[in-house]
Amino acid sequence: MEPGSDDFLPPPECPVFEPSWAEFRDPLGYIAKIRPIAEKSGICKIRPPADWQPPFAVEVDNFRFTPRIQRLNELEAQTRVKLNYLDQIAKFWEIQGSSLKIPNVERRILDLYSLSKIVVEEGGYEAICKDRRWARVAQRLNYPPGKNIGSLLRSHYERIVYPYEMYQSGANLVQCNTRPFDNEEKDKEYKPHSIPLRQSVQPSKFNSYGRRAKRLQPDPEPTEEDIEKNPELKKLQIYGAGPKMMGLGLMAKDKTLRKKDKEGPECPPTVVVKEELGGDVKVESTSPKTFLESKEELSHSPEPCTKMTMRLRRNHSNAQFIESYVCRMCSRGDEDDKLLLCDGCDDNYHIFCLLPPLPEIPKGVWRCPKCVMAECKRPPEAFGFEQATREYTLQSFGEMADSFKADYFNMPVHMVPTELVEKEFWRLVNSIEEDVTVEYGADIHSKEFGSGFPVSDSKRHLTPEEEEYATSGWNLNVMPVLEQSVLCHINADISGMKVPWLYVGMVFSAFCWHIEDHWSYSINYLHWGEPKTWYGVPSLAAEHLEEVMKKLTPELFDSQPDLLHQLVTLMNPNTLMSHGVPVVRTNQCAGEFVITFPRAYHSGFNQGYNFAEAVNFCTADWLPAGRQCIEHYRRLRRYCVFSHEELICKMAACPEKLDLNLAAAVHKEMFIMVQEERRLRKALLEKGITEAEREAFELLPDDERQCIKCKTTCFLSALACYDCPDGLVCLSHINDLCKCSSSRQYLRYRYTLDELPAMLHKLKVRAESFDTWANKVRVALEVEDGRKRSLEELRALESEARERRFPNSELLQQLKNCLSEAEACVSRALGLVSGQEAGPHRVAGLQMTLTELRAFLDQMNNLPCAMHQIGDVKGVLEQVEAYQAEAREALASLPSSPGLLQSLLERGRQLGVEVPEAQQLQRQVEQARWLDEVKRTLAPSARRGTLAVMRGLLVAGASVAPSPAVDKAQAELQELLTIAERWEEKAHLCLEARQKHPPATLEAIIREAENIPVHLPNIQALKEALAKARAWIADVDEIQNGDHYPCLDDLEGLVAVGRDLPVGLEELRQLELQVLTAHSWREKASKTFLKKNSCYTLLEVLCPCADAGSDSTKRSRWMEKELGLYKSDTELLGLSAQDLRDPGSVIVAFKEGEQKEKEGILQLRRTNSAKPSPLASSSTASSTTSICVCGQVLAGAGALQCDLCQDWFHGRCVSVPRLLSSPRPNPTSSPLLAWWEWDTKFLCPLCMRSRRPRLETILALLVALQRLPVRLPEGEALQCLTERAISWQGRARQALASEDVTALLGRLAELRQRLQAEPRPEEPPNYPAAPASDPLREGSGKDMPKVQGLLENGDSVTSPEKVAPEEGSGKRDLELLSSLLPQLTGPVLELPEATRAPLEELMMEGDLLEVTLDENHSIWQLLQAGQPPDLERIRTLLELEKAERHGSRARGRALERRRRRKVDRGGEGDDPAREELEPKRVRSSGPEAEEVQEEEELEEETGGEGPPAPIPTTGSPSTQENQNGLEPAEGTTSGPSAPFSTLTPRLHLPCPQQPPQQQL
């Protein structure tokens, strides 16, 4: 069976060791410890502790190397034998003029080597044919039976192998035509192996890696192209019988061949024997035939296609040539036309003298049988690795390696299993079909390129961490030169042995079976990268492995006996194991060590891109193996790396520097070496060589002191000759020096035979010094002579072991333990004596007991050393025993005096030793102290003790010595504690109970608990709570009986305090109800005034705006309203908390705030009026540019100016008035072109801070406030606001009732009536100048015209507060208004400056009020009519109205689609019908929608109560009787005079008396 044909079976794993940190600190010691186990496997793996991670010290950027080229199937021994065999056959057929083609049988290449070998084993070709055993041959080649494969193999053997085997056996065969054999499978051409040729040509580039065999591609044949082109070569063409031979050089250059080989495409695995002559007939050989048959076949041989002429004869004038011009067979020179000249040796043969004879002169190059045989039997050249031509960095090599592996396995490199790589590797090395080539950066000198470990040198500064690893024994630069290592005594830096080598690997790169130089140890560390797979064989099986490899591949070892020392040969571990060789394996991962032991064969390969470092080291146990290795090298005639004798002598010269174990091993080796040297020099004397001279061999180069016979490096002695000065031999080969006489030969020696024993003696003294010392120690420890040594003598022995570096033996450990124990005893004895001197101040817990003292004395007596402290310890023991007797006597005579017991106890403490009786004395003393403490605690005159003290006494009483007095005291304590805990629990329940008890109940509990003589915390807390409750009741009585109603803050504080008290208070419920009612009123007032998500508090809205003049303050407040930074009541009114309780102070502060607000708004109006209009300004911000509340600069159309502060805002950012609807409750129709009545008035959100409810709504809040027995700041502010509004209303009515204003209002009324009479609103009339005396016939309500007044067909539209306008009508209304804008003219009134100024001032003051008044709208209409219509504002309002209506329609359609989807899905969620019924105005977005929604919410919340009857105003039925609508009917009361007069007493001020025209 072909080795490796089956799947690879991994060998067992080698031992793996994981040392602890303590073991890891001594590398060679740990290796010696594990050697008995690991040596049995040959290799082992060591995993360092997890924290040991040396940094990678190689300079990556400067690291450049040239790798070796490895062809995998040339590494394996058996595969190389096959390849060499195929090369020989190929060479044979190539000489014959044909190229080898290997046939395919059963879809695999026929193994010609195995076929030839099996044929020989079965008895040869003739025997197999005779016995018809070709089927057995097929079976042994693992071919399936029953397919007539035997016959197929026979034909292949006959035509390919048999002619070569016959030539090898010496038969004379010439080229003959054989019958062609038509095979069903295509043969495959074989490319000759030619290892020497490959080593001399340029290597292929790495981008041409191929998985299939390049050797199986067509080999470029010797071409005739060069011959045809070169006329000189054309003249040298030789014609004659026989095939051409390669020796003439008529072929393409190697460079051309290599180029074709690289550039040629991959071909399927085929092998052929190709006819080189260019003919159609294949030149094949069959079994030998008779001469006549061969002659007959040759006569029918076709002529070759190559045109050739007869060979030119040589110059006949050459006599020597004429003499040699005879046939070598018959020695005749006649019939020269039948004479053939060999192209190889120039011998002549008659064509009829050859066997078989040739019918005619063959054309082309012809070789005689002798030359063919010589060429085929030429020995192969030694195999070795060739170097690549490309230089790599680590990065470029890694990229190449990873790319190769990923492409080969078709997966990422980290995902390829190690088992798969291992099987594929051994498959490739066993394959002759596939030729995979890899590169391996092996044996890179760390001295030149730098080590992977940190190195302590002057090249660069090391960090503390690097310094630690640079000195570590596991650093491969340090390990070979450790003190216990042999190699530290070699001065030279031996690369690979003392100086580490570096290895940069890629997948499949391998190191072959080998052992280390001089059979030394080796250690390999994998710095990083993918694993490295190792195989190892123990040293006991080393010779067996060599025998197996020689047996399986004798062809290799015949030509290279030291093949295994060349690191170029692999053999499948399964093959070795099948022949009984024990093999182990391991995968070395990054950060792990692999150690190989002496003469342990090992090999392996890399799983991928990695970086490793290796070095050799030798320990004392290696010395015998090193000596045996020299003898082995002598037999193989292999060069030594260093002289073993020199190493031994150098160590023997300085024995004191040697480790003791090493000295013993060196002594043993030195003794053997001296005995051998005596024997060899004696043999010289017997031969008669007496001349000698001293030679310092260590000063000579190694190549000048090598034995010319065995290549051993000489040191102790060598034999030289005066007449042959160029060579010398070791004393083992004295007969191989030269043929000169012995008298001319002389001995060259390093030491005399007298000097060697002296060196040996020094080694013996060093080795035996340990035995002498050990004997002294043994006598001292065992006191064999009856004399105890002093402590100083034992210390001297230990110091001697340390100074002479004795090994850490068991005896040394016993000595150290003895010294340690003795020193501890001395220290303890000194402490005992010093403790007595310290007396009671000695440290507690360090005293020894009496038993320990006696044991300590016995321990000191048993130690093998004398100590004078023993006497002191004996004295202490006597004192303690005397004290013990006295204490026993005192305890026996109880009851004794407590003072006597205490003094006796103090004396015992001074001894420094614990006596058992001392504990009894201590307990008696503690009992007396406890009884005294109980008496003091229970005494009537004593301070009441706490529960914790009583519990502590009970606990302490349980530990004192029992007695009747103790039992009685414990019973009294327990009874008192039980009663106290019961009352304490009752008080706790009163404090924690949800149902609070009245003060009377708590007083009763406290009175009863006062009789208990114990401090009770809960009772005390109950007392304090009761006192606080009484104080709280007093505060309530005081605040309720004051001059004014209590403030809400005071009530809230009392309620908070009362709720925290654990006492039931009747007044608390009443206060809580008052506070709740006040909060309810405040909430209702907030909903009435405050907008949704308002940034103002209710009090801020009701009070005058203190910062009305600061635009930036108002804006920042508006933009940062989410921060909730509201001012307190005192900040708003500028009053202290005490002043807020005085109503008079509140009113005065409110009045002052009104004045500040008015002054501030005037200043703000002047500032804002000075700003440029955004309708004409640019978008660039400046110090005078208006900025909207959104923070953006105002520019272009769409901006509105506030009628109060005169500042500008984006229409989309604020609430704007609506032209097509009126929010008034009683609207009246107005003509379409009465533009002055359109609702175009705009107040910004900074000026209009609240909802501005009507006065009747405020009066309802005041009526509810009147019923509250609580004062609120908001209530008083609301009263002040109401007074301010009524005051302004009176002044406004007075102004409207003047003659000038009444006339102007009359003209407006007349003009409105005239416009109502117009038939077509599309054709507005030209307005005449309004007469100055037209009276005002209608009321001055603010109500703007309804939408139906604007429609051409008079359709009515419901108010938008309830139902959204219809889509069509609203659109037509907007279009109508837009078309009427060009027709608006004005002003329609002429207002004199004397009339306009007061009205404008009244208008400004009215806009400052957070109350809605009809007079305000009347004044605004009058001022509007006195100026031209603001067409720009009207257009802006129309555009905003259109945009809002468009958004409402879109939201309505989206809502309908969402409702339908929910209906289709049947899903749950919000009721779509409810959403549909909601006003679209409410669901719209923007500030206007929010205000409408807030108004509707307020109406729903206040709908139950409702405001009182509206106050009659101008235009209402109650005032229509009066022309000016200002004076009430005689004897009637109008306005809020009566309600206000009832509210005023809450402020404790008289109701203001107003003139009749100012009252409502």
Swiss-Prot record:
Protein activity control: The inhibitor KDOAM-25 and others inhibit its demethylase activity, resulting to cell cycle arrest in myeloma cells.
UniProt catalytic activity: N(6),N(6),N(6)-trimethyl-L-lysyl(4)-[histone H3] + 3 2-oxoglutarate + 3 O2 = L-lysyl(4)-[histone H3] + 3 formaldehyde + 3 succinate + 3 CO2
Basic and acidic residues biased stretches: 1335-1345, 1464-1481
Domain JmjN as annotated: residue spans: 14-55
Domain ARID: 79-169
PTM annotation (Phosphoserine): residues: 287, 301, 317, 893, 897, 1359
Sites where the protein binds Fe cation: 514, 516, 602
Co-factor(s): Fe(2+)
Effect of residue 751 to C: In MRXSCJ; impairs enzymatic activity
Domains as described in the record: The first PHD-type zinc finger domain recognizes and binds H3-K9Me3.
Name of the protein described by the UniProt record: Lysine-specific demethylase 5C
Encoding gene per record: KDM5C
